[in-house]
């Protein structure tokens, strides 16, 4: 084991016990598992023979689940409907050791559910059940109060915005302002509909496609990635920007450092964002890729924990990339444990 590996191993141990608040769009990911060996006579689609079904936390809930699996104390903040899926989210939180008192119930809102039908390790179709209108002012105020009340006991806050209406401009701005006042770091997974609400964040974490939307251009070469990273730093006035790039790893841009830092993944079984990068590299051994669902949430979770533990962003990025390499080897929305993360670090 190298000196760097030993250092990362110590960092993994330091992640446990951190207190992280997660605010955003909590969803339920449902899976229908089956087999498919024939086509329907009614339409050119496969017939899936049902085997079983399962459900896990999705969206901001997947961030919370990853944090909890890594040993953090997690305080979730969001809105769910007064319906069966909303109850299922509370049950999933409880099963993972998280309280749901930070969730606000809205009788007029349906809980977001994403149902995936999977056969032979292949997703056949996804059905989304959701509403995207912004929260009412009363609900918004209730959620903000709950977050502000808890800030004194948090080491970091994650805002996970999937553009389902829970994260409003007012909520983002007021939470960021209060976090700044208290010295609590804030990591944000932003949406393009809120270009100004996240100014002053500690770190912005997005994928290459989202970064391209922000700078209104396609990121198709090394130069465009660098320009996007610098533009996002300037626009959001944040300390760092992390752009995830699927099988090509991730890139880190810092407000105090001129050169970008790239953590390269050697796996090429799947590619979300095929963008070349030749900057400072740290390799992550290639792994078999089954499903990229939620890999970005895992990156966000590990970054948040590492920053809460006062880990430098570059070291945090190496850990986050290693974690993503583990979860893409699992089918469905997945989490990572400290044991799995330690094993991945030792393989670097």
PLM feature segments, named:
Residues 235-239, 269-344:
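Conserved post-catalytic alpha-helical subdomain immediately downstream of the catalytic base
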Residues 26, 162, 298:
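Active-site metal-binding loops of divalent metal-dependent hydrolases
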Residues 15, 151-152, 195-199:
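A short, aliphatic-rich alpha-helical micro-motif
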Residues 103-109, 116-151:
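Conserved phosphate-binding/catalytic loop of the ribokinase/pfkB sugar-kinase fold
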Residues 153-166:
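Short acidic, glycine-rich surface-loop motifs adjacent to enzyme active sites
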Residues 165-282:
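Conserved phosphate/ATP/ADP-binding segment of small-molecule kinases
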Residues 1-37, 345:
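Positively charged, low-complexity intrinsically disordered leader regions
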Residues 2-12, 41, 45-113, 343-344:
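Substrate-binding N-lobe of the ribokinase-like
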């Amino acid at each position: 084991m190298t000196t760097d590996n030993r250092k990362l191993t110590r960092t993994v141990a330091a992640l446990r016990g951190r207190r992280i608040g997660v605010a955003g769009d909590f969803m339920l990911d449902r899976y229908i598992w089956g087999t498919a060996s024939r086509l329907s006579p009614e339409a050119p689609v496969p017939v899936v023979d049902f085997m079983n079904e399962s459900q896990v936390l999705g969206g901001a809930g997947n961030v919370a689940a990853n944090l909890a699996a890594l040993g953090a104390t997690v305080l979730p903040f969001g809105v769910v409907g007064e319906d069966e899926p909303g109850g299922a989210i509370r049950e999933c939180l409880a099963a993972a050791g998280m309280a749901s008192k930070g969730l606000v119930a809205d009788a007029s809102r349906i809980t977001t559910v994403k149902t995936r039908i999977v056969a032979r390790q292949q997703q056949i179709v996804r059905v989304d059940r959701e509403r995207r209108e912004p929260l009412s002012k009363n609900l918004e105020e209730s959620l903000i109060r709950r977050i502000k009340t808890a800030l004194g006991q948090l080491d970091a806050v994650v805002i996970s915005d999937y553009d389902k209406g829970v994260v409003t401009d007012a909520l983002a701005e007021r939470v960021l302002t209060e976090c700044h006042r208290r010295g609590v770091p804030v990591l944000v997974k932003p949406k393009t509909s809120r270009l100004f609400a996240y100014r002053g964040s500690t770190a912005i974490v997005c994928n290459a496609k989202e970064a391209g939307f922000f700078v209104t251009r396609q990121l198709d070469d090394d130069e465009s990635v660098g320009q996007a990273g610098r533009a996002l730093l300037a626009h959001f006035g944040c300390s760092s920007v992390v752009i995830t790039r699927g099988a090509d790893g991730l890139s880190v841009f810092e407000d105090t450092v001129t050169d970008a830092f790239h953590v390269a993944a050697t796996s090429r079984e799947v590619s979300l964002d095929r963008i070349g990068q030749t900057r400072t590299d740290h390799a992550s051994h290639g792994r078999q890729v089954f499903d990229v669902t939620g890999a970005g949430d895992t990156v966000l979770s590990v970054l948040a924990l590492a920053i809460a533990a006062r880990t430098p962003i570059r070291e945090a990025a190496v850990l986050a990339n290693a974690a993503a390499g583990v979860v893409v080897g699992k089918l469905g929305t997945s989490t990572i444990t400290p044991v799995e993360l330690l094993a991945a670090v030792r393989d670097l």
